[in-house]
Amino acid sequence: MRRKEKIKALLWVAGFAGIICLIYFMLQKGEQTFGVAKDTEDQVQVETSDELEKLLWKSIKFGKKKYQYSSDYETYLFLGTDGSGHESANREEYVGNMADFLMLAVINRKEQTYALLQLNRDTMTEIDLIGKDGEGMATANMQLCTAHWYGGTEKESSENTVNAVSKLLGGLTIDGYYTLNMENISRLNHAAGGVTVTIKNDLTSLDPSMKQGETITLTDEQAYRFVRGRMGVEDGENTSRMERQKQYLEAFLAKIKENMQEDPQTALDVYDEMADVSVTNISGGTITDILTEMHTAENRGIFQIEGESRTGKHLDDGLEHAEFYLTEKGIVTTVKMLYNIKE
């Protein structure tokens, strides 16, 4: 009898121990499951936070330092190309023109402000040497204007220039581009109804009527000479021509604003007029919105990044060409002012 009681007691202890082990196992399993759920929840929160940050902020990076700026800013690149290439050819024989004129429009619709950044075409920077197929991994330190040489179509050349400008400015997000051959400035001037400028220096070598101090409404042919003339004009430097291009752009925008007061469709009409000779990924509606915004917004001015002009042989053709060197400090200072970046 006692033997049976001992066996029962042992069985009871074993059963009780089994129940304890089972409860412990279930608790441990619960903690693990809870931990997985908690980890998943944390991961979702991090991903949501990252997505929200992307919506609120854009970023650029210079060296090891990262800067953030508000996503309220929109940035568009406007290009004016020369006639040095062979852009009417098929992909195999295509050679892009060089970019004579590069201007970024920086717009903040929320704050109702805009600013422009004019870039020197001779700025030395990293260029992607893409091939006729639009592909390529090699890069070279060359003038910014040469980015438009590469590619197999005008679209690819424009996109390569966008990439070069973006890299120059720390990976800046560029929301769209508009490219126009400078040969069509006469047509653009005509579409605006003529642009009025005051001649700041003696430009009679371009046109006898372009005397210093004279205020004239440029004819279509005069407009072309005014923005394109370089060799034998003033000091022959691109920086002097940039000043005239800047002056013409300011006067052109003023003319468009004036015309829009009478006809709000002016910007779209000009866009449509130039559609067959331009290359862009910006719609007519967006262009109209941009110019409408600029019509009423505060103009913060036209910025330039200071640098040093030299000559060099980076084009590897045995000849010396103009080269313009920026400093990282100069770039960062200008970009911080443009996008109101505070540390």
PLM regions: where:
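Non-catalytic, solvent-exposed segments at the cell envelope interface
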Residues: A9-W12, F16, I23-E343
